[in-house]
């Protein structure tokens, strides 16, 4: 096996991209290094950057769809191969890039027969589609498909109410996460006194891994800047004051309960097929090499949402089963 060799600075802290690849329009990869770091610094920066990459970068998604021909989400429309639910799921997968602030409107107006793809979406000039070939629907007859869309820029993911809006439109649970995955690793040298931080970033194509790295860094810096203004820590808020009631602090009670339960059971020996999961969820987990309860607990809610065909409802069902049977919770984000 040939060992990889890279050139790093000996004194000045520097970063650089050591590898980049485009698997498709909707999957970009970048590998970066930061060095030289003192012992322990790489892990501190790596953990913070991973959290910022996955949770602090805004993305643009379709969040609502409206059509006069739709009676309910699970209906079928004559002349359209897909069900309404399948069309909504296809719209959820559309990757957008924008300079949008807040929300805006878009639309689809197509006459069949033929395929409806992302390129058929009529967008405002400040929103663009990353992959025009993404499939939306198949029209098998000469009918007209008209859909109004709401587009929103935000971060994280939102769970919208399952009911329709008052205007008859249907919510789409958006995942505003342009970074699909991020990992960090550490290489030690000089007898363990110096470290190199490696950051791997996969994006959905709405921004490059390098752009994601820059934006996550800016957002992380913005979060820390208030700590530099020590003279303003008791600044009067005047009309902007807001009193927040604090709940009882039960962290240690929950931790003790979790530790006690973990000691009573061998997590490796509890297989997920023993936990009342529906076959579809079980198969999704199995395809991601999750076979035991321990495998499942090594993932966060965000990790599950990135699995193919996984939905918000599936995550909620898993959380309910973990709480009911094992008194265990699954974190939203992985530290």
Swiss-Prot record:
Keyword Plastid: yes
Ranges annotated as spanning the membrane: none
Annotated spans, Alpha N-terminal domain (alpha-NTD): 1-231
Catalysed reaction, written as an equation: RNA(n) + a ribonucleoside 5'-triphosphate = RNA(n+1) + diphosphate
Chain residue ranges for the region called Alpha C-terminal domain (alpha-CTD): 263-335
Alphabetic keyword roster: Chloroplast, DNA-directed RNA polymerase, Nucleotidyltransferase, Plastid, Transcription, Transferase
Keyword Kinase on entry: no
GO biological process: DNA-templated transcription
Primary residence: plastid
Domain of life: Eukaryota
The family this protein is said to belong to: Belongs to the RNA polymerase alpha chain family.
Protein name, per record: DNA-directed RNA polymerase subunit alpha
Organism of derivation: Helianthus annuus (Common sunflower)
Taxonomic lineage from the root: Eukaryota, Viridiplantae, Streptophyta, Embryophyta, Tracheophyta
């Amino acid at each position: 096996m040939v060992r990889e060799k890279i050139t790093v600075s000996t004194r000045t802290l520097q970063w650089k991209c050591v590898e980049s690849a485009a698997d498709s329009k909707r999957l970009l990869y970048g590998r970066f290094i930061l060095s030289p770091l003192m012992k322990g610094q790489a892990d501190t920066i790596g953990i913070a950057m991973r959290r910022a990459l996955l949770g602090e970068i805004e993305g643009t998604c379709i969040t609502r769809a409206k059509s006069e021909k739709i009676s309910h989400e699970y209906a079928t429309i004559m002349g359209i191969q897909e069900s309404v639910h399948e069309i909504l799921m296809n719209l959820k997968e559309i990757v957008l890039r924008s300079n949008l602030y807040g929300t805006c409107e878009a639309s689809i107006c197509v006459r069949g027969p033929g395929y409806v793809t992302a390129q058929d979406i009529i967008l405002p000039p400040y929103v663009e589609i990353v992959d025009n070939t993404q499939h939306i629907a198949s029209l098998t007859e000469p009918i007209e498909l008209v859909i109004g869309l709401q587009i929103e820029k935000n971060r994280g993911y939102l769970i919208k109410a399952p009911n329709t809006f008052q205007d008859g439109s249907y919510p789409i649970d958006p995942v505003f996460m342009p970074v699909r995955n991020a990992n960090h690793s550490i290489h030690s040298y000089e007898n363990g006194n110096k470290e190199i931080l490696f950051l791997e970033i996969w994006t959905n194509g709405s921004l490059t891994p390098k752009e994601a790295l820059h934006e996550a860094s800016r957002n992380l810096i913005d979060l820390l800047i208030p700590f530099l203004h020590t003279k303003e820590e008791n600044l009067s808020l005047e009309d902007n004051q807001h009193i927040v009631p604090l709940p009882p602090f039960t962290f240690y009670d929950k931790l003790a309960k979790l530790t006690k339960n973990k000691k009573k059971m061998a997590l490796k020996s509890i297989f997920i097929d023993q936990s009342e999961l529906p076959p579809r969820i079980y198969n999704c987990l199995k395809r991601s090499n999750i076979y035991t309860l321990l495998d499942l607990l090594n993932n966060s809610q965000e990790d599950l949402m990135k699995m193919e065909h996984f939905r918000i409802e599936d995550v909620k069902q898993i959380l309910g089963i973990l709480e009911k049977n094992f008194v265990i919770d699954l974190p939203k984000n992985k530290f």
